[in-house]
Amino acid sequence: MDYESIDRLKQVLNCKVKKTRNDIRHELHNKAYNDSLQTEIRTLEWVLGYIVQKKVHIAKLEVIVQDKIADLKVRMDKAMHREVTDFLFTKIETLRWVLYVIHSINKGSLIVI
């Protein structure tokens, strides 16, 4: 069951990365928006890399993501520049979305649109 959950999570994250890459249109969006999308992609790829490299169980991954969010919140509280807080906020929100997906997979209620 756990391998199925991890495989499902990887599938959802890969789909989100692909969709986000397709959303980047340099002609249509401003630089700040594209930077935000790039940060989202890098964060999702970090989670995917962690899954593949460490071969963690989904419960362990949930704890790791929660710890990373807590660490980023501390860093955001100490940040002195708007660019840094925007960057950290995007990472935190992306990781919160990953937690939502993990919880949905664990409950068996994941709906992908």
Label the predicted regions.
Residues 26-34, 54, 58, 78-85:
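Alpha-helical rod/repeat scaffolding segments in eukaryotic adaptors/tethers
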